[in-house]
Amino acid sequence: ERHLPECSEIKSLFYKKNVVIVGAGPSVNQELPSLKQYRNNITIFATGHIAGTLLREGIIPDAIIITDPQPHMYQQVKGLDTKKIPLILLSTASSSVLDYYEGPVYIAYQNGYRKAEEIAEKIGAKAFETGGSVTTTALDIALQFKAEKVIFVGVDLAYTGGNSHARSEEHT
């Protein structure tokens, strides 16, 4: 069993920063130029689902988050150059990700799951709200780590143009 440091170790990535949470909704495609344009003024917090698209577009996230317990989640990061990008992994997320993620990995504990709450309390760590969504978890992390502003990109909460995800992310 691999011991993972707790995600508050990288809270400075978010503290007093303008954090852009990037989801894999179809609207992300039209926002890629804006992400490039403002890259130096924002902290990009990407869901695992969109990380590959961002990297292929030359947009390197400041952090990536994965919360899903499904065993195939490793496919979101397999083959990506993530050596310098911290990953926040929810305590109940698929451990398969650890076999393929090349960069530093930090654990986040969630409210609503007793074992995670107990561990967080025992070690003095924060526990985060998930709302059943990776973007909700990312939002609570950004807020608890005192982000100045939080902006959503690609968090559509709808079928934009009849699509549930961005072009290249449809089946991952």
Short names for language-model regions:
Residues E170-T172:
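Conserved small/polar residues in nucleotide/adenosyl-binding loops
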Residues T43-A46, I60-Q70, P86-L89, V105-Q110, ...:
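Short hydrophobic/aromatic-enriched beta-strand-loop microsegments
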Residues S96-L157:
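Active-site/ligand-binding-proximal alpha/beta "capping" segment
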Residues I50-D68, A142-A166:
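Glycine-rich phosphate/pyrophosphate-binding loops
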Residues E1-T43, G52-I60, H72-K84, S95, ...:
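N-terminal donor/sugar-recognition subdomains of glycan-related enzymes
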